[in-house]
Amino acid sequence: MATSIDVVDLKGKKAGSIELPDSLFDVQTNIPLIHQVVTAQLAAARQGTHKTKNRGEVSGAGRKPFKQKGTGRARQGSIRAPQMTGGGIVHGPTPRDYSQRTPKKMIAAALLGALSDRARGSRIHAVQAFTAGEAPSTKAVVELLSGVATSKHVLVVLERDDELAFKSVRNIASVHALTYDQLNAYDVLVSDDIVFTQAALEGFIAAKSTSAATKKEEVNA
């Protein structure tokens, strides 16, 4: 049985309701799977441009720094040796690509598992819109969110063409905004509450339902 959540207007009053399909918002939350997907996502975000110079790359002459015997010091062959100050680094980091290949089905399952966890905790909300008129208003968004989601970290999910809402929320430190097609397990997990606009939630449900129907047809074909 699908769960329903209230849709509130700009004044924070109930303006309707919308159903959250069990196939999207009440699936198993596989913690090891989510951990693997999020770890891969964070790894892919690394630049991987770290680099140190080995003894063949640091500057310095190739001559022997002092004679082999008679100084009382340990013998040295080069000022570029790793034990010398300013010498090369042994086994230092080199540029590399940290990205991992994660199957699309795993990424999708991790997202739905994270959303289902938030839905079961009554942490998913819906609003009609964040702005009214043709001008962005951060003040209006803050007032609306104060009555909808009072947690420290809030994820706002919008439609891609909702520029007024993006401009209204981008200056709020505790709010992170995404479009519904950018939703991912990591951003859901680091947010205490997820607030959709009604249009964004309907778009997300429609997109996922269409994708599931297409896959079913391919299997039956």
UniProtKB/Swiss-Prot annotation:
Region (Disordered): 45-100
Assembly with partners or alone: Part of the 50S ribosomal subunit.
The protein's name: Large ribosomal subunit protein uL4
MF GO annotations: rRNA binding; structural constituent of ribosome
Keyword RNA-binding recorded: yes
Segment forming the signal sequence: none
UniProt similarity note: Belongs to the universal ribosomal protein uL4 family.
Protein keywords: Ribonucleoprotein, Ribosomal protein, RNA-binding, rRNA-binding
Gene3D superfamilies: 3.40.1370.10
GO cellular component, one term: ribosome
